[in-house]
Structure formats: C-alpha cells, structure tokens
Amino acid sequence: MSGCPFLGKSFGYAFKPLSAQGSEEDKSQAGVNRASKGGLIYGNYLQLEKVLNAQELQSEMKGNKIHDEHLFIITHQAYELWFKQILWELDSVREIFQNGHVRDERNMLKVITRMHRVVVILKLLVQQFSVLETMTALDFNDFREYLSPASGFQSLQFRLLENKIGVLQSLRVPYNRRHYRDNFRGKDNELLLKSEQERTLLQLVEAWLERTPGLEPHGFNFWGKLEKNIVKGLEEEFTKIQAKEESEEKEEQMAEFQKQKEVLLSLFDEKRHEHLLSKGERRLSYKALQGALMIYFYREEPRFQVPFQLLTFLMDVDSLMTKWRYNHVCLVHRMLGSKAGTGGSSGYQYLRSTVSDRYKVFVDLFNLSTYLVPRHWIPKMNPVIHKFLYTAEYCDSSYFSSDESD
C-alpha cells in the first residue's frame, strides 16, 4: 500500500514526535505573575477582610458558641448582598424610564437585560432557602434566644425593593397593627419615605404602555377595532349555539357563553376599570391596560417582541417574589411552628397573610389571559400599519444615556 499521499515525504511535511509530557505543560506555565509586581490584588479589590470578618456569633459572644448560627448569618448576609444587586439593577432601569431614554427603543435592550438579571437572581434567592433547611428546628432553637429583637422584617433593602417595584402602601398587611415604617429609625426611615415618594417601576411602565404605538384613535385604533370584532364574534357564537337543538349541553354552552360575554365586554367598561383601580384590584391605568393587551396580541411583530419580553420578566419578578415569600413562610413554620417571631410579630400567621395578590404589583399582566380571544377576532393590520410595526423608534439625542444608566 502506498498510504495516504498527504503524509508522504514528497509534500515536505515534517512532524515532530509527540511527547508524553509534551508542550502543553510548557504552555500552561507561559504566563506572567503580575501580582508579584504589586498593585491591586483580589482580596483588596473585594474587601474580603471586611466581608469575611463580618460574622459575629451572638451565641459565642454570650459564651455558648452554637455551630449553626454561622450558617444563619452567612445565608442572610448573602440575601442582603443580592438584594443590593437587585436594587442596583432596578434603579438603573427606573432611571432609563425616568429620563425618557426608553423613548429610544434601542435602549430597551438594556432594560430587558437588567430585568432578566433580576429574575435570575430572584430564582437563586428562592433556591437558597434549601441551604437554611439543612438546619433543624432544634438547631435553630439553640441560638434563637440570642437574636431577639432582631427580625427579618427589619430588612431595609427588602422594604426598599417592595416600594421601588410598586407595592401599594394601602394594601400592605399592618405589622402588629402599626405602619411598617415605624420599625425603622433615622436615616433608614428617611430612605423608605423617599422610596415611597419616587416614581415606582409600576408607574414608569404604566406611562410607557400608554404610549404603545397603535392605540391612537385616529391611527390604527386597536381598542376600537378590538371592541367591534369581539362584539361581532360574540354575536356569531350566540347564533351558533342558538341554532342547536334544545338539550342539556346547549344550556351549558349558553351559560358558559354568557359568562364569556360578560368578561369580554367588561374590558370596554372604563368606569368599571376605574372602580377596580380604586379598590386596588387593578393597578394599571385603562390606557396602559390597552397597551399591554396590544403587545400581548401582537407579540410576534418585530417591534413588540422586546416589549413582550419585558412584560414577561415583570410577571416573573412578581411570581418569584411570591415564591420567595411562600418559601420563607414554610421555613418559619418549620422552625417556629405557631410561636411569635423574634421581632414580636405573630410569626407564621403574619407571614402567611403576605402571600397574596395584595403584594403582587403587575397583577394586571397576569390577568391578560382572561381576555384571550380566537386569533381571527384580533384586528388585522393593513400594509401601512404592518410595516410600521417593523420600524423601531429612535432618537440620537436620547440614545446616549447618562453615565449612571450605562
């Protein structure tokens, strides 16, 4: 056999023999140790001396060192660090909305990237409870007496997070019949008050949704066309059911139809919406709800794909905050049973009352599924409007955002 011609000597290839220890070891040692020349090093950059020495066991200070208190402190400090990062991301998103940079749709990538990061962090925080669950109730009881009157309710950052997202003060469950801010003093109280006065993420998103292209009555007029199509569709549905022979099945279908009709037509009752808004059962303005539903229906259009992702991430934040509360409730129930909390609250009973839609901020986005209709009921677009939804709006002067939001 002549063998492979490409390996022949006639081609002039000369292969070096392979070594067992080879050149890989040499390459792995080819770098330069820059740290030996001085300058910033890892520990100094992260200020690890402060971070790693910030665990003071109260049990040890009282002369009775309890092993699991260290885990308890580390876990809660990790929570607070992640809360700080969430607030950092949330503030940057709010600033983009606040300064009008979101009018340039190219900035929406920043918004959804940072909101996605918030979602991923919250997923981590929900899972982190499993670490605390490695501690038994008896283990916790060994050092619990040293914690009072400290309480998780006193987490300033978590309360700031609630306020900045948009939890309504009127819907908060009172803490021992007192306003939640009464548990904070001095600068902390001032920060909470300031966060209540600032525009929330909910309010900023609401204003953004109200500007959804296609809502203009003298333009595409999505809302007017949707109402017309739904009324027509309901009439056709009624005619189909009415034409059937009398039977128990027909009665059931007619009853279901009446329910569907009431729900869908209520969508166009602005006074009813305002009434539900005043009761806290709805959070978005009537026009913002229209914008959200339009994005929901036309989410496959290029211009609405990114806005739809944002609405999805906002719902994820709400869901994960609820899961976090629920996991917290379960952990407290496991550790304390029905005993009072270290801060003096009713413990499990109080926490359980916070796992509800009262603390959901973007509840209207979840409820959009209530108004799903057959695709052929959704208003069709003419070529001009369809082309319009392929074109993003941008403004060079607003594209360059401030340093803080970069």
Curated annotation (Swiss-Prot):
Substrate binds at F72, I73, I74, T75, H76, R144, T342. Pathway: Amino-acid degradation; L-tryptophan degradation via kynurenine pathway; L-kynurenine from L-tryptophan: step 1/2. Pfam families: Trp_dioxygenase. One of its GO terms (biological process) is L-tryptophan catabolic process to kynurenine. The keyword Disulfide bond does not apply. It catalyses: L-tryptophan + O2 = N-formyl-L-kynurenine. It is an enzyme of class 1 (oxidoreductase). Homotetramer. Dimer of dimers. Heme-dependent dioxygenase that catalyzes the oxidative cleavage of the L-tryptophan (L-Trp) pyrrole ring and converts L-tryptophan to N-formyl-L-kynurenine. Catalyzes the oxidative cleavage of the indole moiety. This is Tryptophan 2,3-dioxygenase. It comes from Bos taurus.
